[in-house]
Amino acid sequence: MEAYLKKLCFEYQVDEKEVKELLARMEMVYLDKGETIASATMSEQSLYIIVSGILHTYTTSEGEDKTIRFLSEGDAVLCYNSSQYAVKALTKCAAYYISEEEIEELCASSISFANLVRQLMEYQ
């Protein structure tokens, strides 16, 4: 867990204390291989921080999938405006999850959380 936290803090240039506080408010979810967490047909907006496994972010144009990026341990993905892309698990995954409503509540209650979420969004 310590190595994972250090990677997350380094990758997104955030304080370890803030990340620990955010993770404490998030729910651990488990995704099956092939499970989609964002697509044009899904309206939910949420944030996932990957603990294990690999996610594939891609667009579909003229029936062909075009890779945007692959995500793995320590990466974060903010699922919003999903009409432009989809996110699917390539392997079984474990991830921390928080809904848009909970993100908004946290950001309204704390400047630190608002800055943390802003920094995570900048790396999308």
Per-region residue spans from a language model:
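Cyclic nucleotide-binding regulatory module and flanking cytosolic helices
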Residues: 1-28, 75
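Short coil/loop residues immediately preceding or within conserved phosphate-binding loops
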Residues: 26, 44, 82
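Glycine- and acidic-residue-biased ligand/ion/polar-headgroup-sensing regions
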Residues: 34, 44-57, 74
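Short solvent-exposed loop/turn micro-motifs enriched in small/polar/acidic residues
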Residues: 22, 40-42, 79-80
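Conserved short histidine dyad/triad with adjacent acidic residue
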Residues: 13, 27-42, 60-63, 71-72
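Cyclic-nucleotide recognition modules
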Residues: 62-123
